[in-house]
Swiss-Prot record:
Keywords: Activator, Amyloidosis, ATP-binding, Cytoplasm, Cytoskeleton, Disulfide bond, Endoplasmic reticulum, Golgi apparatus, Hydrolase, Immunity, Inflammasome, Inflammatory response, Innate immunity, Isopeptide bond, Leucine-rich repeat, Lipoprotein, Membrane, Mitochondrion, Nucleotide-binding, Nucleus, Palmitate, Phosphoprotein, Repeat, Secreted, Transcription, Transcription regulation, Ubl conjugation. Residues 1-93 form the Pyrin domain. A motif (KFERQ-like motif 4) lies at residues 990-994. It comes from the Eukaryota. The pyrin domain (also called DAPIN domain or PYD) is involved in PYCARD/ASC-binding. The FISNA domain is a critical mediator of NLRP3 conformational during NLRP3 activation. It becomes ordered in its key regions during activation to stabilize the active NACHT conformation and mediate most interactions in the NLRP3 disk. LRR repeats lie at residues 741-761, 770-791, 798-818, 827-848, 855-875, 884-905, 912-932, 941-962, 969-990. The modification Phosphoserine is found at S5, S161, S163, S198, S201, S265, S295, S334, S727, S734, S805, S974, S1034. A lipid is attached at C130, C836, C837, C843, C957 (S-palmitoyl cysteine). One of its GO terms (cellular component) is NLRP3 inflammasome complex. This is NACHT, LRR and PYD domains-containing protein 3. It comes from Macaca mulatta. Sensor component of NLRP3 inflammasomes; inflammasomes are supramolecular complexes that assemble in the cytosol in response to pathogens and other damage-associated signals and play critical roles in innate immunity and inflammation. The core of NLRP3 inflammasomes consists of a signal sensor component (NLRP3), an adapter (PYCARD/ASC), which recruits an effector pro-inflammatory caspase (CASP1 and, possibly, CASP4 and CASP5). Homodecamer; inactive NLRP3 forms homodecameric double-ring cages that hide pyrin domains within NACHT-LRR rings to avoid premature activation.
Length: 1035
């Protein structure tokens, strides 16, 4: 009965609700706060329910007591105080067995109804504020989705755009933080830096702000660095869209604000509140509520490198108040330095040229480098760009055949330009084969297709417009200016009508949020036109300013540009100079003159060649990365005669290669270098995990990273790679058979591998190959290439020096190698086999070489587990009178005193042996005693003996002292890292004073000697100045 009574009572209350209030009541039933311990009712069941059905549903879902409490709470929520008070007074008496609703605000009997009503209103007010905040979040997300869901298609008609999600192609991101030295240049690799020992780590967008491990703090600042056109802005926009779409950072950020740095720099003063307001859809956003939780805000600052003159070390007081108006640079600096909303997170995009400046402002940032498109993603981009699948397939196949162009397409901007050109040529039936080999060629074709005059007066007007564009670009480059006002355009002879035409032709883009400001479609286009500034012949020669303008134009003297090139090696001039080389190609010059009806000067060619000659003689380009950067300039030119003349100035080439583009460029230049005498090539490579996956899927991996210099990729030298391709090796190594002067080749520290080695060996067997010294340490070789090397040894009589250290050749590989070493035509004199995974099993083969080879004089087999047995085998053959071995290296070979008798017998019989290296073997005092027997033999001619770290004590010093007074040949004795003690050293001091001791160099451990020993050593050096005592650090 009670159940029916409660349901009837509740139904009567609901019956008093008018239709509007009843709808509100049902809405609150659906959104009833779960923390109040009641189950909300599904909309499908309440939508058509009348007051009786609704009361029944409430009781069925929650029981009588909770249903009544829900009704009372909702009466207050819909502002029906009359029903609220009446229901409170009419509340049934619940039995003790019923579970009470633990909500003192709603059903607490101790408080008066008035107090309860006021408390409930306050609670509902808070709920309403939260709801409004959530409502605004939803509104803001909707606005961000609409703003960022489309991107302008630079090929499209005015007003047309494409879907960002449909066009976006995933970019490769790696978690990197490199030093200034590594970021000096995208081609820089000093010495033998082993970047392959530190593989790069890929990172996904959703993990950008996650800690590195469970013990680390969350990341609050992320820096996206990458070259021009690599996709920084498109990636930033994609992050905005994904967040607004609910697929990214939902649990971390309530608001993401996109800040275009160059736009902020144009505004005189504004507050952070103003900046946030400019990002919002309406003029009155709840800014105070937004900034009240800064940890829930992410500021996405795009284009830090585009700030004009900002972030000086002495910028002045920083801003800490979000309501205070400041200059744009101060505002951004305050955010970046965490003075303004320090709990907020930042995501900053920049070109590497500004990275050092930015780094000083940041505290523990996460650096993420954008590597562009992988091969698979390049293919994906083509298929997204071309709506017709057949066209996409044909275009991609064509590009794949052109390795250079295909490599360049890892840069999204270049990929877009190539696709645009291909589409235009497909539509006109032309071929892209010869117009897309270099960056200059691609840009030349693309821009000339847009700037074709229609004849008559339009030709003259086009030339004037082109000159204006070039002078504007050059003036901007020299002043590091990328945004131009209408007054700038007028100063360079460009009118509004001209700009509108260029807008349609996409040479300029009008800034959406910055009226009356213009910029080149991309920095590289500005650099291209700046290069043309030095080549276009004006109608009025010698003009230095525009008529009607007081503007002073940059000097057109190319020598001024080239002189400043070195000073701006991390700046904008590098690519201008590259374009300059590319544009003076004679065929390209004729093409441009025909297409643009403008005259282009050829005088600059001689100046460029003279500049190279001067720099070469001054040795300015012998230091990396300038030498490789020069190769890029020459490659852009694509004229073999010019390149050959330029390369004649560089007999010695030392470069480190990171990208396939590096390979192609260097191969082109080296092939045209006929006077090179020494060639040293290093290869840097790392493979992110995602690239390894692509390799497993059978995709051909490219070494892709920025080929743009300075502002384009000054820091990007640690790049991804698999093994060097055979095609590249053939191209590069072909120079070995054509250059008569090239005698040295250093390929140490690269991933040449067996396939590459096979190609190299084919070249080394060529009769015109003059290589005498070949270094192949750490090249990833195995026993599989040893047969090919053996063929070289048995046929190439010019090769006299070979280093194969740090390659896992193994015993079987040495067996194959020894076949060539024993050949009558083999003239090899020096052989390094250090750390080649050898054991005593290979010693029989090596021993046979020692007894048969007439040329081998130096053999280094240290860092291999040869052991006493292996060395005993070598010694047996080394005693042969026909053995010409002069230097033998057995460092860290696992030797003990057991092999010393065999070594001693070699010393007493082989008068050719002058150097013996035994460091790192536990010979002990007993071993030295045995060794000294051979050393004291009259026929022993040993000059250098290294016994560092051989477990020696003072007990061996008597034998060694005897040796020092008796030996007529020994000049250097190294005893470092042995505990000889004061007694042993004092014994040496006495012996070394004697005139019969001819030793010139003594190596001892750097250890604490007593006062007497120190005095004796000082006295010895004073009395015998010809003796050098070297104190080596103890290990």
């Amino acid at each position: 009965m009670k159940m029916a009574s409660t349901r009837c009572k509740l139904a009567r209350y609901l019956e008093d609700l008018e239709d509007v209030d009843l709808k509100k009541f049902k809405m609150h039933l659906e959104d009833y706060p779960p923390q109040k311990g009641c189950i909300s009712l599904p909309r499908g069941q309440t939508e058509k329910a009348d007051h009786v059905d609704l009361a029944t549903l409430m009781i069925d879902f929650n029981g009588e007591e909770k249903a009544w409490a829900m009704a009372v709470w909702i009466f207050a929520a819909i502002n029906r105080r009359d029903l609220y008070e009446k229901a409170k007074r009419d509340e049934p008496k619940w039995g003790s067995d019923n579970a009470r609703v633990s909500n003192p605000t709603v059903i607490c009997q101790e408080d008066s109804i008035e107090e309860e009503w006021m408390g409930l209103l306050e609670y509902l007010s808070r709920i309403s504020i939260c709801k409004k905040k959530k409502d605004y979040c939803k509104k803001y997300r909707k606005y961000v989705r609409s703003r960022f869901q489309c991107i302008e298609d630079r090929n499209a008609r005015l007003g047309e755009s494409v879907s960002l999600n449909k066009r976006y192609t995933r970019l490769r991101l790696i978690k990197e933080h490199r030093s200034q030295q590594e970021r000096e240049h995208e081609l820089l690799a000093i010495g033998k830096t082993k970047t392959w020992e530190s593989p790069v780590s890929p990172i996904k967008m959703e993990l950008l702000f996650d800690p590195d491990d469970e013990h680390s703090e969350p990341v609050h600042t992320v820096v996206f660095q990458g070259a021009a056109g690599i996709g920084k802005t498109i990636l930033a926009r994609k992050i905005m869209l994904d967040w607004a779409s609910g697929t990214l950072y939902q649990d971390r950020f309530d608001y993401l604000f996109y800040i275009h740095c160059r736009e902020v720099s144009l505004v005189t003063q504004r507050s952070l509140g103003d900046l946030i307001m400019s990002c919002c859809p309406d003029p009155n956003p709840p800014i105070r509520k937004i900034v009240s939780k800064p940890s829930r805000i992410l500021f996405l600052m795009d284009g830090f490198d585009e700030l004009q003159g900002a972030f000086d070390e002495h910028i002045g007081p920083l801003c800490t108040d979000w309501q205070k108006a400041e200059r744009g640079d101060i505002l951004l600096s305050s955010l970046i330095r965490k003075k303004l909303l320090p709990e907020a997170s930042l995501l900053i995009t920049t070109r590497p040229v500004a990275l050092e400046k930015l780094q000083h402002l940041l505290d523990h940032p996460r650096h993420v480098e954008i590597l562009g498109f992988s091969e698979a993603k390049r293919k994906e981009y083509f298929f997204k760009y071309f709506s017709d699948e057949a066209q996409a397939r044909a275009a991609f196949s064509l590009i794949q055949e052109n390795e250079v162009l295909f490599t360049m397409c890892f840069i999204p901007l270049v990929c877009w330009i190539v696709c645009t050109g291909l589409k235009q040529q497909m539509e006109s039936g032309k071929s892209l084969a010869q117009t897309s080999k270099t960056t200059t060629a691609v840009y030349t074709f693309f821009l000339s297709s847009l700037l074709q005059p229609r004849g008559g007066s339009q030709e003259h007007r086009l030339c004037a417009h082109l000159w204006g564009l070039c002078s504007l670009a050059a003036d901007g480059i020299w002043n590091q200016k990328i945004l131009f006002e209408e007054s700038d355009l007028r100063n360079h002879g460009l009118q509004k009508a001209d700009v509108s035409a260029f807008l349609r032709m996409n040479l300029f883009q009008k800034e959406v949020d910055c009226e009356k400001f213009y910029s080149f479609i991309h920095m590289t286009f500005q650099e291209f036109f700046a290069a043309m500034y030095y080549l276009l012949e004006e109608e009025k020669e010698g003009r230095t300013n525009v008529p009607g303008s007081c503007l002073k134009l940059p000097s057109r003297d190319v020598t001024v540009l080239l002189e400043n090139y070195g000073k701006f090696e991390k700046g904008y001039l590098i690519f201008v100079v590259r374009f300059l080389f590319g544009l003076v190609n004679q065929e390209r010059t004729c093409y441009l003159e025909k297409k643009l009806s403008c005259k282009i000067s050829q005088q600059i060619r001689l100046e460029l060649l003279k500049w190279i000659e001067v720099k070469a003689k001054a040795k300015k380009l012998q230091i990396q990365p300038s030498q490789l950067e020069l190769f890029y300039c020459l490659y852009e030119m694509q004229e073999e005669d010019f390149v050959q003349r330029a390369m004649d100035y560089f007999p010695k080439i030392e470069i480190n290669l990171s990208t396939r583009m590096d390979h192609v460029v260097s191969s082109f230049c080296i092939e045209n270098c006929h006077r090179v005498e020494s060639l040293s090539l290093g290869f840097l490579h790392n493979m992110p995990k995602e690239e390894e996956e692509e390799e497993k899927e059978g995709r051909h991996l490219d070494m892709v990273q920025c080929v743009l210099p300075g502002s384009h990729a000054a820091c990007s030298h640690r790049l991804v790679n698999s093994h060097l391709t055979s095609s590249f090796c053939r191209g590069l190594f072909s120079v070995l058979s054509t250059s008569q002067s090239l005698t040295e080749l250093d390929l140490s520290d690269n991933s040449l591998g067996d396939p590459g080695m096979r190609v190299l060996c084919e070249t080394l067997q060529h009769p015109d190959c003059n290589i005498r010294r070949l270094w192949l340490g750490r090249c990833g070789l195995s026993h599989e290439c040893c047969f090919d090397i053996s063929l070289v040894l048995s046929s190439n009589q010019k090769l006299v020096e070979l280093d194969l250290s740090d390659n896992a050749l193994g015993d079987f590989g040495i067996r194959l190698l020894c076949v060539g070493l024993k050949h009558l035509l083999c003239n090899l004199k020096k052989l390094w086999l250090v750390s080649c995974c050898l054991t005593s099993a290979c010693c029989q083969d090596l021993a046979s070489v020692l007894s048969t080879s007439r040329s081998l004089t130096r053999l280094y087999v240290g860092e291999n587990a040869l052991g006493d047995a292996g060395v005993a085998i070598l010694c047996e053959k080394a005693k042969n009178p026909q053995c010409n071995l002069q230097k033998l290296g057995l460092v860290n070979s696992g030797l003990t005193s057991a092999c010393c008798s065999a070594l001693s017998s070699v010393l007493s019989t082989n008068q050719n042996l002058t150097h013996l290296y035994l460091r790192g073997n536990t010979l002990g005092d007993k071993g030295i005693k045995l060794l000294c027997e051979g050393l004291l033999h009259p026929d022993c001619k040993l000059q250098v003996l290294e016994l560092d770290n051989c477990n020696l004590t003072s007990h061996c010093c008597w034998d060694l002292s005897t040796l020092l007074t008796s030996s007529q040949s020994l000049r250097k004795l190294s005893l470092g890292n042995n505990d000889l003690g004061d007694l042993g050293v004092m014994m040496f001091c006495e012996v070394l004073k004697q005139q019969s001791c001819l030793l010139q160099n003594l190596g001892l451990s750097e250890m604490y000697f007593n006062y007497e020993t120190k005095s004796a050593l000082e006295t010895l050096q004073e009395e015998k100045p010809e003796l050098t005592i070297v104190f080596e650090p103890s290990w």
